A protein has these predicted regions:
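Carbohydrate-binding surfaces of carbohydrate-active enzymes
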Residues: 1-105, 111, 360-361
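Beta-strand/loop-rich accessory regions of lumenal/periplasmic or secreted enzymes
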Residues: 47-49, 78-362
Length: 362
């Protein structure tokens, strides 16, 4: 048996090129008997940190690959910073405008309009074309109550900051000069000391994060960097690998004998999002995550209709169509892996952030 390693460089979302192998070689395996453990070794190549993914492949005595594993070389923030460095610069400046009911951030032909009464995104346009991301961010698995909001310019970037009471402290929206819209959400910040009457979280916590509305009728597929190509559950993540994946839209319901079954299933939770492009001839959209370990929920799969009545096999999905989640539920099973999470805020906690960027440009 033998193993080999590869350092892979992945293309950015706007390029459909295949991944590039920057370096590869053999892994030095220890001489061990079945059931024993040992340490494998290989030397890092000079170009190691120029890559995005480390891939390990195992081969049997016949030379057939029997298993492979992938590991990210860069965390989400470093990957996104490098992506931004590759983008063309602009001398333009973002701006904002307001009326009695709304706030609008504007840059490079992209406009994002928010409701003054609750801080929610209500409409996005690229030129005259409406991108149907709206009605969010709605809280998932937690409570948050709109408190206040303010607008400002920071250099060439327009910033809309929304303050909340409850489990969420604030969401900062940034319109960059090139038209990218950033969302920086701070949650579980005990230091904020916002007074909120009631329970901060759902009990139990099955999903935890934020949701938006986005109709699926015009979506033709999805291309993404993260774990794939399959959807996941909290206790069904093993077996997925880091990489750039592509799948066409389908409504496969496993167990429905009268449907054409197309795999991988399109709808569901996707692990460790770096970026994802929802493909559409009319309203494409790409989202990037600067935060490690975010689950991307894409629409809501149907339950089997003709199964025996033995209870629902999966937990209820969040409201909305697209969700960005710190936590997802497990598929029903025995053992601790199927248990819901428990969240506790301790005195002095600074909270943690979810940082996303939305690209509505063609």
């Amino acid at each position: 048996c033998r193993m080999k390693w590869k350092v892979m460089r992945l293309p950015i979302p706007q390029v459909s090129d295949s991944p590039i192998c920057l370096a590869e070689g053999g892994v030095l395996l220890p001489a061990i008997q079945p059931g024993e453990k040992g340490i494998a070794h290989f030397d890092l190549p000079e170009k190691f940190f120029n890559g995005d993914i480390l891939e390990l492949e195992a081969y049997n005595v016949a030379g057939d690959m029997i298993c492979n594993w992938t590991f990210p070389i860069k965390n989400n923030r470093k990957y996104f910073i490098e992506y931004r460095y590759l983008q063309p610069t602009t001398t333009a400046t973002a701006r904002y405008q307001t009326d009695d009911n709304s706030v609008t951030l504007i840059a490079n032909g992209v406009t994002a309009t928010f409701n003054k009464a609750n801080g929610n995104l209500v409409e996005v346009k690229n030129g005259s074309k409406i991108i149907p991301l709206s009605d969010g961010p709605l809280p998932v698995g937690m409570k948050m109550l709109f408190c206040s909001a303010n607008l400002k310019m920071q250099g060439d970037t327009a910033i809309y900051t929304v303050k909340y009471k409850g489990a969420a402290d604030s969401i900062v929206w940034r319109m960059a000069p090139d038209g990218l819209l950033g969302m920086d959400a701070l949650v579980l910040n005990y230091r904020a000391k916002n007074k909120f009457d009631g329970v901060y979280f759902d009990r139990p916590v099955l999903n935890f994060g934020f949701s938006f509305s986005f109709p699926e009728k015009n979506i033709s597929g999805m291309r993404w960097l993260g774990k794939g190509p399959y959807r996941v559950w909290k206790n069904r993540i093993e077996g997925t690998n880091y990489g750039i994946w592509q799948k066409d839209y389908n409504n496969t319901v496993t167990g429905e004998y009268y449907h054409q079954l197309i795999y991988p299933e399109f709808k569901g939770y996707h692990a460790d999002l770096y970026w994802a492009t929802l493909q559409s001839k009319t309203t494409p959209m790409t989202v990037y995550s600067e935060t490690d370990g975010i689950f991307f929920r894409v629409f809501t799969p149907e339950e089997q209709r003709d199964r025996e009545s033995r209870g629902i096999s999966v937990k209820e999905y969040p409201a909305g169509d697209l969700s960005f989640l710190f936590e997802i539920p497990a598929v029903n099973s025995q053992g601790t892996g199927g248990e819901a999470s428990y969240i506790k805020i301790n005195k002095g906690d600074d909270g943690f952030r979810m940082k996303l960027w939305f690209d509505f440009r063609n």
